[in-house]
Amino acid sequence: MPNLANIDNPYEDQEQEAFVKWLDDNGYPRFRVPNETYTKSHKQRLKNKKLGVSSGVPDLAVVVPNTGTRRVYVETLDSDDSADYDQPISRLVFIEMKRRKGGVTSTNQKKWIKTLNEAGIQTVVCKGCDEAIEFIKSITK
């Protein structure tokens, strides 16, 4: 993890690397869709588009445990194996990382953030690793 304490305004990828390290160290499953749209090859850009690459998709998806459970009944063909149990509730949140100072959210990023939030998937912009950590802590209290 890069030491960001001595850097006035780390790059976005440095902030994200530090945040991913914190997520891993604290047991939060996460993933990043490799969704970069830049490439010199016109052929590759066309292929990327056909494969679903979309400009503006948030940087990280994080699985966050919630504090509750829900009662689930699982019925099997063999009724002796049927059971109900408490299933922990988790949720998926998306985070768009930006630099502490000067990071700008693009029009396409704003559209994705709005679309995901309207679909009930909490999506936020965090300026720096510390803000992202505080966001995760705030929704897991």
Spans of model-derived segments:
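Catalytic phosphate/metal-binding cores of nucleic-acid and nucleotide-processing enzymes, i.e., regions
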Residues: 1-141
